[in-house]
Amino acid sequence: MDWELYLNYFGDIMPLTLLVGIIYGIVIHYKNKDTYRWRKICSVLFVCYITALIQLVLFLDIMRGFSYLLIHHMDSGNINGYFHFSGAYNFNVNFWSHIDSEKIGNIIIFLPFGILYPLHSEKISYKRTLLMGFLLTSSIEILQPFIDRSFDLNDIILNTAGVFISATVFFVIKKLILNGKIEYA
């Protein structure tokens, strides 16, 4: 997949992502008065990330259709007949056969999860972050055949690798800061 295409997709998913983020931000601002401001900001960013991720990997055709409708005031044809089972699946683990932008994208798209998930709550551990990242990517892959996309075991492995990389870096830096090895301004 081309990087320019990802940037176009970004524009398609932003309206709903921002709307969900604003509504969630207002709710947690009034609901959790004693929570630190930076924790609230991290929670809003996490919710925005999850909203964007779900739109991008599960509902991109629908979101592109709505985006087209908003801009051009006409149906793009992307929404009709969307929900049906494709039956496409791939259980072959072959992500090293050739590295392309789609495989790199599968890692990159889950890098924010390993950082934002533990930042939105104090009590989230490294193991829990990895587990939740794996469960999220597995759930997304399991749902894909129901929306005319394919299940691919490589995606689960690469997405989980993205969570592993970012969570490892995050928790190592966090431990160094807490032990006084790195000064935090």
Which ranges hold each PLM region?
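Loop-to-transmembrane alpha-helix initiation sites
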Residues: F151, D155-I157
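Bulky hydrophobic segments
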Residues: M1-S150, A167-A185
